[in-house]
Amino acid sequence: MSKKTIWEYLKAKGFSNVATAAVMGNMEAESNCISQRLQGDFTSGCRKSVEYTEKVDSGEITRDQFIFNGPGGGGYGLCQWTFWSRKAGLYDLAQEQGVSVGDEFIQVEWLTRELWQAEFQPVLKVLQTSQNIRECSDVLVKQFLRPADQSEAVLAQRAKYAREIYSEFAGEQAEDPDGMPDTVEVSEAEYQAMNRALLVVMYLKDILNMLEEFDYD
């Protein structure tokens, strides 16, 4: 599943552009949006993650071993699910649907089902009402994903990922928490018009300076 497909899937679930970007920004931080990603796997092509997923799917790694992070387990998937009950939900849903636990669609489906659970209703409410990317991203970090590191640097980086994704898929520039855009993009015609306006202002300023210096006596 490409990032665009994840975007469209979440949008089809009713999430706004802002909420979708916040979710995907956190996925980017957690797993680089790779659904088979196993925590700590930096091998080429995520080879270790692929092998681990195959063992889970085949039953060589049992359900209990998967959900309790052993052997060689840990955070897994798009959101790096780690807590046993949440991994159990993902595993059981994949089994129910007859697909791999590393399947992108099943993971996004599980994510949305989790957000509708009573425990995460406060998170869902923010995602459904806020138009602030930083606010949506922060609530996902602090109340949904709950990584060990929730420092300002982490929060800022995840919000940055979210704004980049928003700009890529929503077709417009995302806003910072203070309401100011990251950058302002203008067309060549707009740029030339601004230059002409600036020249006029400078010209008028020169005229005023000359008039001030003119001796009317």
Specify the residue positions occupied by each region the protein language model found.
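Export/targeting segments at the very N-terminus of extracytoplasmic proteins
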Residues: 1-33
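Peptidoglycan-targeting cell-wall enzymes and recognition modules
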Residues: 5, 31-128
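Generic structural hydrophobic/aromatic packing signal, biased to beta-strands
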Residues: 10, 79-81, 162
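Surface-exposed patches in mature extracellular/periplasmic domains of secreted proteins
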Residues: 14-24, 35-42, 121-132, 136, ...
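Extracellular structured ligand-interaction cores
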Residues: 20-24, 75-78, 108, 137
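Conserved beta-strand and immediately adjacent loop positions that scaffold enzyme active sites
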Residues: 23, 65, 182
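Active-site-proximal beta-strand/loop segments in catalytic clefts of secreted hydrolases
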Residues: 25-30, 82-84, 143-144
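Non-catalytic cell-wall polysaccharide-engagement segments
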Residues: 87-217
